[in-house]
Amino acid sequence: FIPTFASHGFRYVEISGNGCDISKDMIISVDGLAISNIDIVTGEFECSNSLINRLQHNIRWGEIGNFLLIPTDCPQRNERMGWTGDMQVFAKTGAYNMNIKSFIDKWLDDLIDAQTMYNKNGAVPDTAPLGGDNRIDGCGGWGDAATIVPWEMYETYGDIHILKKCYDMMKKWVEYQSSTDRRNYGVRTVDGKEVPEQSDLATIPYIQVQQCRGDHLTYDNSTPYIYSATAYAAHSADILRRTAYILGKTDDEKRYTELFENIKRAFNDAWVNDDGSVSYYGEVSSQTAHCGESVALDGSVTRYTYYAENTPHCPSQTAYALAVDFDLIPTDKLKNTREYFKNSILRNNCKLTVGFLGISHLAPALSKVGLDDVAFKLLEQEDNPSWLYSVKNGATTIWERWNSYIAETGTFGDVSMNSFNHYSYGAIGQWFFTDILGICPVEFGYKSFMLSPKFGGGLTYAKGSFTSPYGKISSAWKLHDGKFTYDCTVPTNTTATLKLPNGDIHTLVGGSYHFEINV
């Protein structure tokens, strides 16, 4: 079976007429052929946990089913649009799993067209091509696909054409963000009330003021829109300054380096405390929050009320993930921030609360500050909300919501918007490659790269590969009798820097290698 003229996602099919008068043929079996614009597998991953293996399968299967003409959010309902937020969080995972270079190159043309056609000020609509319920004025974390996706593609494939083609779009988006910050809008009101003076948000320049989708479908709704939008504005400015350097645009590099530092400074003035913790105040968002307890470094516990006026909230997993992964925390505060970040996970019993904007940054941020053990606990969590909860309950692709289906009560999430094939939360897949296998580019396109495998949780082995533009990179490790054995393959004409778990560092050229260390 193969669809003609239209494609619809489905899981089950009913065949009627078999054995009746209308059919003289006996149907023995039916093969359904998936329609997709991507068919070259570039990433393989396997480990000792069968549920994680199924999760990896579901991530890839959802990618294949949604990458048709445009990266749709879901293939089975009346939406099926190229949501920018979905694509930017999944871009790196998608590029590890499959060769998406040509597919995304075409979609970036759609994104450029959408920006050019619908907003002359540089805003990026929420979908490309434009359609349905979205904002042509763009919003933080979604319009940032204009910078993030080209950058991720350049990192993976090393094709400078991508940056050259997209540079004007990237620059227009960052300039648009700059035009919508506090310097140009003055005091912000939410639901008719001014942002509280205690937070200093009413006067700090470079803070984003746009109201937008924020950390979409988060479980605790406690990350203010302007927090995530400002964090992403800093990240886009950072990407643009690096892009300007690569393209030899010296004046732009200087300008956007300064802009990044200014936004970072404003972010810290608004939300980062002297002790490295993050806090924000109730009236910065109209969302309803649930945040529980905050545990300070000295072990003292504070329970915050729920969006009471001028009351600081215990920050979300997303709040810390964005601040850490975007390098917004000053170095002298990072050690303390690490502990608060860890607590944001542990106080929720190692269950997820992140939404769309936090999902791709949570595990990488934890690893960045040496909290690999916490990242493994999150990955191996089987209770809701978690990545493996859907797997345990029969999912074959990634759910749109953490609570798309609750087995314990037999209930479904909001049926008006509840997709069972929605790739965004599959963004954890990048961490399988970058951290468990340890395959990361150093030189764009993997001319040189890192191999820094990590073990943790209950895993006893992991193995996999990534086919880079220079050839297949393989990485495999195993734990046995107190020893860590590691095998890898480095493509010809490339160089790898291997960092083993005990800290040993080796420089490798093309060939296959075997290592064994005590752990």
Predicted features along the sequence, with ranges:
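Extended acidic/polar, glycine-enriched regions
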Residues: 1-49, 510-512, 516-519
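Secondary-structure capping and boundary motifs in well-ordered enzyme cores
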Residues: 5, 51, 79-83, 135-145, ...
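Active-site acid/base region of carbohydrate-active enzymes
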Residues: 22-58, 64-65, 71-89, 93-126, ...
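Short beta-alpha connecting loops at secondary-structure transitions
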Residues: 44, 131-135, 211-225, 278-282, ...
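Well-ordered alpha-helical scaffold segments within catalytic/enzyme domains
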Residues: 89-100, 146-162, 232-250, 319-332, ...
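Extracellular polysaccharide-recognition and catalytic grooves
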Residues: 285-286, 298, 311-417
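Non-catalytic C-terminal accessory modules of carbohydrate-active enzymes
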Residues: 373-519
